[in-house]
Amino acid sequence: MIDNHFTEIADLESLDRFVANLNGSAGVVFKHSDTCGISARAYTEMSKLELPIGIVVVQHARSVSDEVEKRWQVNHETPQVLIIKDGKSVWNASHFQVKADEVAAAAAKVDSEQ
């Protein structure tokens, strides 16, 4: 079950819609595995944030996960967080580097660089 804090990205249309709805602000694409303990910890971290967060559960949306890798030229990892601004990936982290305070700081920095 996905927390109400997240927007589920289950197909390419919902990925495009999520990115478009950011309207120039920074947002997060969070690739999550529902069978991984490290990903469960990252899920808890991401739940602390007050940012737009789109979640891709890789077991249910493999085509979306593949598109994230292709579109933003990042190697596939889970858990993985990408900060998206103006349709571009401007920051990313994976595994134990997925920490709420670091994601929030990176997003704030990106948003201040207008």
Task: Report each predicted region and the residues it spans.
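N-terminal leader/targeting and pre-domain segments
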Residues: 1-23, 113-114
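Local sequence-structure signature of Cys/Sec-based thiol-disulfide redox active-site neighborhoods
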Residues: 15-49
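Thiol-based oxidoreductase modules, predominantly thioredoxin-like and allied folds used
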Residues: 31, 51-67
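Amphipathic alpha-helical interface surfaces
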Residues: 38-45, 60-64, 68, 79, ...
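Non-catalytic interaction surface on structured domains
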Residues: 41-54, 70, 85, 91, ...
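Structural micro-motif
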Residues: 72-85
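Non-catalytic, surface beta->alpha helical segment in thiol-disulfide oxidoreductase systems
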Residues: 85-114
